């Protein structure tokens, strides 16, 4: 159920994962699913704890890249880079290594190291003409890094390549390419009808204090599920800053 909902309704998937944890916290698949549900809701401390638990139970190295990305989400890009250079990366399959490269490049950008991010993404997988499941995302990330570095012509070229390989629409490369080409999208909504339609005001006007504030995860709010078998469990330190 969590896997089915995680893309369409991350919050509901997270709610289901909490129930599953209460019922079967010693099942590795449950811990992993809970980790992805927390990750989809940007609860990075909780996600990292669940991924670590799942890895302890199975010894599976496939979670290494997403664990590193959790470190990025917690504002620790240096830790993510350390993980990108760890021996575990050599044990990943090709897809995992590409994912790790994407995370490392993102960490470089977090640290305002744009040139280093570009170099990190340069690889045989990027240069290959074959289309793999990761190709569109890799080309997109490279194009986006080039654009951030002010290399617009090269960025346009790679956004176009990303469009060619994005068979399932996993990126918005086509929109980014159109934006670079100066294409303007016009809303099909009839503005004259909008002018004629009465505007109903519901409820009192919200004050400045009622406005939404940015969400910040507090490590103290993270609910951990572990037992005496989780010998390596170490509670997450409270995020600094």
Spans of model-derived segments:
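Structural motif corresponding to the intra-repeat A-B loop/turn of tetratricopeptide repeats
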Residues: 6-8, 41, 74, 111, ...
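Residue-level signature for tetratricopeptide repeat
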Residues: 4-5, 37, 68-70, 107, ...
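Intrinsically disordered, compositionally biased tail regions
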Residues: 208-241
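TPR-repeat structural position
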Residues: 10-11, 44, 77, 114, ...
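Structural register within alpha-helical repeat arrays
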Residues: 1, 33-34, 67, 104, ...
């Amino acid at each position: 159920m969590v896997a089915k909902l995680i893309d369409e309704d991350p919050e509901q998937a997270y709610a289901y994962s909490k129930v599953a944890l209460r019922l079967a916290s010693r099942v590795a698949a449950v811990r992993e699913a809970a980790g992805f549900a927390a990750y989809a809701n940007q609860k990075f401390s909780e996600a990292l704890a669940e991924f670590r638990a799942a890895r302890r139970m199975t010894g599976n190295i496939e979670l290494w890249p997403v664990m590193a990305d959790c470190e990025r989400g917690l504002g620790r890009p240096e830790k993510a880079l350390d993980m990108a250079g760890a021996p575990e990366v050599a044990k990943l399959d090709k897809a995992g290594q590409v994912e790790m490269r994407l995370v490392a490049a993102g960490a470089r950008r977090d640290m305002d190291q744009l040139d280093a991010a570009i170099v990190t993404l340069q690889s045989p997988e990027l240069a290959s003409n074959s289309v793999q499941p990761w190709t569109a995302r890799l080309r997109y990330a490279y194009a986006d890094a080039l654009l951030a570095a002010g290399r617009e012509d090269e960025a346009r070229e790679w956004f176009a390549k990303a469009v060619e390989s994005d068979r399932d629409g996993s990126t918005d490369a086509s929109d980014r390419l159109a934006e670079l080409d100066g294409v303007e999208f016009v809303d099909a909504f009839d503005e004259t009808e909008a002018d004629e339609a009465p505007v109903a005001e519901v409820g009192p006007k919200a004050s400045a204090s009622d406005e939404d504030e940015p969400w910040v995860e507090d490590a103290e709010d993270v609910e951990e599920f572990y037992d005496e078998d989780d010998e390596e469990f170490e509670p997450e330190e409270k995020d600094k800053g």
